[in-house]
């Protein structure tokens, strides 16, 4: 008897739940609530490469996650904008639409083109106020047709009241409130439309800090909480060719990561006018993973010598990009992360459609 009554109660509960789910879907639309075990739910995180193999590995999932808020911060001239332009180039390669909200009014389009950004398809906005920048971002996210938005930078998102006020006016907390309100509004839409939003941020010093780290980022604490990934990028040295400085040695630390264990770091070279030296990373990480063999100054792959000295091998891989991708994907496989060709599920279907057409 007890068994029958418990079954009946369970059946009633199941019916009540089904009715509630149906009502929610009717009111808020299909997909507003679902069982995690259902096929419609995506278990795998869609990612986009950062343009750096080492950083993709450090992130643990093979790149930056889509449908999330990302914060990239660091001192001046550390490579923040370069890194975001590389991400834009990678997103465009796989068919994504990208927007650059240039609040600093300092985007160098020639440099962006050198990094592989397709300027013809890039959406660029240079807003007058912080409110305007965030309203434009909100409109682009809600459209559902933009895959990546970069905001450069949080420090330049000046509230309208500050612009219209006098130079010496004290308006404490205004920018922090603006960011907090915008992120509350944006987060749910970002997830639903699978759009990645990257905020570039600057570093400030906290006055009077005796112990601990005196560094902080601008725009209050909201961005720290809403970000799924926070990257701290620093210049750690210079790359010289003779006496001439031709690039920077850069270190990126994954300070926060909601999609994989945090606190990993990656080091790579940023060459002036060329961006992240991907080939250099492929060589170093290929040797570490045992994919590329190094004997003295000679480097070999699959029993074939590919060059003597790192610079020669780098040039060889630039001339043979298909070999570079092959080695990179073997390194990714070795690390258990998604290969470059598979970072965007829609691209395969699009490729098939192109083939049929």
UniProtKB/Swiss-Prot annotation:
Provide the GO biological process annotations: DNA recombination; DNA repair; SOS response
Annotated transmembrane regions: none
Q: Which Pfam families match?
A: RecA, RecA_C
Q: Which Gene Ontology molecular function entries are recorded, alphabetically?
A: ATP binding; ATP hydrolysis activity; ATP-dependent DNA damage sensor activity; damaged DNA binding; single-stranded DNA binding
> Which keywords does this chain's UniProt record carry?
ATP-binding, Cytoplasm, DNA damage, DNA recombination, DNA repair, DNA-binding, Nucleotide-binding, SOS response
- Record keywords: Protein biosynthesis included? no
Chief location: cytoplasm
Recorded hits in SMART domains, A to Z, give: AAA
Its annotated compartments are: Cytoplasm
Q: Which InterPro entries match?
A: AAA+_ATPase (IPR003593), DNA_recomb/repair_RecA (IPR013765), DNA_recomb/repair_RecA_CS (IPR020584), P-loop_NTPase (IPR027417), RecA-like_C (IPR049261), RecA-like_N (IPR049428), RecA_ATP-bd (IPR020588), RecA_C_sf (IPR023400)
The record's section on PROSITE patterns has: RECA_1 (PS00321), RECA_2 (PS50162), RECA_3 (PS50163)
GO terms for cellular component: cytosol
What residues bind ATP, as annotated?
74-81
Q: Which family does it belong to?
A: Belongs to the RecA family.
| Function, in words | Can catalyze the hydrolysis of ATP in the presence of single-stranded DNA, the ATP-dependent uptake of single-stranded DNA by duplex DNA, and the ATP-dependent hybridization of homologous single-stranded DNAs. It interacts with LexA causing its activation and leading to its autocatalytic cleavage.
> PANTHER family this protein is in?
MITOCHONDRIAL DNA REPAIR PROTEIN RECA HOMOLOG-RELATED, RECA
The entry's protein name is Protein RecA
Origin species, per record, is Bordetella petrii (strain ATCC BAA-461 / DSM 12804 / CCUG 43448)
